[in-house]
């Protein structure tokens, strides 16, 4: 893996291919390896970069998180993630780059576009579970508060079951999300990673400061992506609302919420049709 030293962290990332830079931002998984099957499909067309977000995988913190980062309304980590991606983009290319964020990674991508538009050539938001600008935002904020409370008091299994039911996660995705790692060490790491995401991201990222105006300013750069196998899920509803209010196009892409690993060939074909 490659390393970029930043304030407070050593950011590690996979890099394959040549030509224009395309950065993938992972969601709850946090690590870029989940994009490697997709990267193999695209490496002849892009320099594909798949990031381990700080606090995840091989990326290392060199300074501790501030105590406030676990507060439900803290924007520290999502803003720091966005800054990391912007600094990575600048280190890799003198030109604006392509960016795709999936799930909570798409929320990070939104903040990249909002705060660092100069690094973005084109950007895609794949099934973003953000609620800030929705008419029923308070309802979804309360639901996420309840889910995190349940995870922290009743355990991860019960809380994630509620999470899946509340967001209407598709069976193809629920099966993959509940699949344990192959080794005991892997299972321990998986548990720690999911608990960290639960405490530091479910509430903070989904209710972070993004508005519809942040999209309309740069609508020519944005594509919304919805999976063909995750119909009627909450993240798809978010994209439908953005589309209705701004006219930014939605493109159907193979697979579910984890389509990039479920159907990487078809996923890549759509990206190449968009950006190739």
From Swiss-Prot:
Keyword Lipoprotein carried by entry: no
Region feature Disordered, mapped onto this chain: 57-76
The UniProt record lists the keyword Hydrolase: yes
GO molecular function: hydrolase activity
Matching InterPro entries: AB_hydrolase_1, AB_hydrolase_fold, AB_hydrolase_sf
Principal EC category: hydrolase
Enzyme Commission number(s): 3.-.-.-
Sorted UniProt keywords: Hydrolase
Top-level taxon in the UniProt lineage: Bacteria
Family recorded in the similarity comment: Belongs to the AB hydrolase superfamily.
Family annotation (PANTHER family): MONOACYLGLYCEROL LIPASE
Protein name: Uncharacterized hydrolase SAB2455
Phylogenetic lineage: Bacteria, Bacillati, Bacillota, Bacilli, Bacillales
């Amino acid at each position: 893996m490659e390393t970029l030293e930043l304030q407070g962290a050593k950011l590690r990332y996979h890099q394959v291919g040549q030509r224009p830079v395309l950065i993938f931002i992972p969601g709850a998984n946090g690590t870029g390896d989940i994009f490697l099957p997709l990267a193999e499909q695209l490496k002849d067309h892009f320099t594909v970069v798949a990031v381990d977000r700080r606090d995840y995988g091989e990326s290392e913190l060199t300074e501790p998180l501030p105590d406030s980062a676990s507060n439900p309304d803290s924007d520290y980590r999502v803003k720091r993630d966005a800054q990391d991606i912007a600094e990575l983009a600048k280190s890799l290319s003198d030109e604006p780059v392509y960016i795709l964020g999936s799930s909570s990674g798409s929320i990070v991508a939104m903040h990249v576009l909002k705060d660092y538009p100069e690094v973005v050539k084109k950007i895609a938001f794949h099934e973003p579970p953000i609620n800030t600008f929705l008419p029923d935002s308070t309802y979804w904020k309360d639901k996420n508060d309840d889910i995190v409370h349940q995870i922290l008091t009743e355990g991860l299994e019960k809380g994630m079951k509620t999470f899946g039911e509340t967001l209407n996660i598709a069976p193809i995705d629920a099966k993959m999300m509940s699949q344990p790692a192959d080794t005991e060490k892997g299972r321990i790491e998986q548990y720690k990673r999911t608990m960290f995401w639960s405490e530091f991201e479910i509430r903070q990222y989904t209710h972070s400061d993004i508005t519809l105006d942040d999209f309309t300013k740069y609508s020519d750069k944005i594509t919304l992506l919805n999976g063909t196998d995750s119909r009627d899920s909450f993240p798809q509803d978010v994209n439908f609302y953005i589309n209705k209010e701004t006219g930014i196009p939605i493109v159907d892409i193979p697979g579910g919420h984890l389509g990039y690993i479920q159907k990487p060939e078809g996923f890549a074909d759509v990206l190449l049709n968009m950006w190739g």
